[in-house]
Amino acid sequence: MWKKFLVGTFVIVFILFMMSKESVSFDVVDDDGKPVTLTLRKRRFQKYYNEVTLSDDENVKTHVFKDKYTLNIWKWKTGRVNDENNEDVVFGVYNIAPHHRIMTNRVFIYTVKDLELQPKFRASRLTYPISDFTLYDIDGDGYDEVVAIEKYKGESYISAYKEYDLKIERVYFGKFSFEISRFTHDEENLSVETEKGKFNVGLKNKEVYLK
């Protein structure tokens, strides 16, 4: 009797656990200069986030991206890519674009207005397929570049992109013959982890280099 009860209780708890959601929250400044909390949610053990909640002191709006609107968010950064908005939200997504019908990693840039994500740039693709990205002011102009690790024909690239007027342009890059896995950075330095160890990322004469 007790054994069946315990088994039944365990099954119910396990199902509820599997159906529960995990979340991550961060703050962003909207177009009116007001602080907004952005929360991403996904089912436990799912790989990607597709539920976005935006909230301030008075209101809450939740957006669920599914079917043809699925985003599959795998990374997020906030920063300021140009002078058009107070702050930008940049998502790394894994989906199909209207003009590039292949599932792949992409970079989407949004601003926040009235608790809505306003698309600023949704890339069909960058120069080459990306494995990671971050925001970093690599040239010291006061605005963040979208810096991406790209892979093409066995080579690794670190490319920096500027976004303006609804388009994105690669302005700096470096080419490397070894595997580069991901970005890490603190307040001062942008670094990458590679098969040869960890290096800081630098820029000289418009060329990205590792030091």
Task: Please annotate each region the language model reported.
Residues 1-11:
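N-terminal Sec-pathway targeting helices
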Residues 15-211:
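Beta-propeller-forming repeat regions
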